[in-house]
Amino acid sequence: MRKGAIGIGTLIVFIAMVLVAAVAAGVIIGTAGYLQQKAQAAGRQTTQEVASGIKIVNVFGYINATPPSNGTIVKMAILVTPNAGSSGIDLSNVKIVLSDGKRLAVYNYSGVLYTGKILDLFNLTIWKNTSNGTFSIAVVNDVGSKMENHHPTLEWGDTVALLLRTDDVFEYEGKGGIGPSTKIIGKVIPDAGAAGVIDFTTPPTFGYNVLELQ
């Protein structure tokens, strides 16, 4: 009788252990599933962040002097296009950050957009409305016709020139603008996705009025 009671007790303990193990396994499996889903979601978000964003095609500078060697870069045009995985980028939320190592400037969208023919980019009338600390937009290619003044949207296949003045921010030897042999770094920062990187050094001498800087 006593042996039977011990056997039943052992069986009860064994069943309890099995139940506890089953519950623990269920918790572990549930937690693992949750963590896997969370990791997948984070991976998708990271992939989207890396794939989307702005790509800088070229950076051009303009020197309003004759000969150019006597002047400084007073205007800049940054040609951009979206990265391959980008959804629409609202350019009204974009910030342009530039630094020459002495000062750092942040440019915001001016609300001015140009969609006509571009025969002389640095002499368009749009520059009259491009003031201190702002950038305007000249549309080079608008595939989906989503470019409008208030919320110009940059989509796959589009190219625009972001136009800004440098003579009201930077200075070289008493003259407004960016001088020769000057290191410039910066970014074109969208509200979501990767920023376009600006990184160039101006030539030691300016031989032309329009220079390709990057």
Curated annotation (Swiss-Prot):
| Keyword check for Transport | no
User: Which residues are annotated as pro-peptide in the record?
Assistant: 1-4
What's a single GO BP term from this record? archaeal or bacterial-type flagellum-dependent cell motility
Q: Which GO terms describe its molecular function?
A: structural molecule activity
What are the subcellular locations of this protein? Archaeal flagellum
Gene Ontology, cellular component aspect: archaeal-type flagellum
This protein's source sits in the domain of life called Archaea
What Pfam families does the record point to? Arch_flagellin
Q: What is its main location?
A: other
Cystine pairs annotated here are none
Q: Give UniProt keywords alphabetically.
A: Archaeal flagellum
| Family under the similarity heading | Belongs to the archaeal flagellin family.
Q: What does this protein do?
A: Flagellin is the subunit protein which polymerizes to form the filaments of archaeal flagella.
Listed name of the protein: Flagellin B4
Organism of derivation = Pyrococcus horikoshii (strain ATCC 700860 / DSM 12428 / JCM 9974 / NBRC 100139 / OT-3)
From the broadest rank down, the organism's phylogenetic lineage runs: Archaea, Methanobacteriati, Methanobacteriota, Thermococci, Thermococcales
